[in-house]
Amino acid sequence: IPAGTAVQTDSATANYCVLQSLSGAKVLDRPSPVQLMKAMKTPAEQENFRAAHIKDGVAVCRFICWLQSHVGKEPITECSAAAKLESFRAQQPDYLGPSFDSIMAFGPHGAIVHYEPTAETDVPLEPRSFCLADTGGHYLQGTTDITRTIPLGPLTEEERRAYTVVLKG
């Protein structure tokens, strides 16, 4: 950037390389006006977000109920659980598809950041421990992203304590 050039940037969000490249410029350090405009939602946008989240919430609640009542009674794996959640979403009006690849992680897999079950890593769900579900959907009204830790059966004292601490914040 030529010396003396006026450049607007937000030092709170710009990366180091960008800030270093502005050393000779006249920097106007303030939030991006584009970000500020995008942050303001119209009443129609707010209503659509609400509608999308209600639809998604219905699908996720149905899935959790199904999962907790069927685990241990029929074969369910991480991959088949993700597919079942997708089928519950597909029953909702205006559903367009997943917003990202589902993370459905049983037991120790839940500790792997951005774990994604594959044919090689897929494991059966058992009526114990937790299933971590990080999923989302695209609806005509908006996009969702939801993460839930679902107990699948009796928990160890350590699991119960850790879960409680996380819920308390």
PLM feature segments, named:
Residues I1-G169:
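Active-site neighborhoods and metal-handling regions in enzymes and metal-associated proteins
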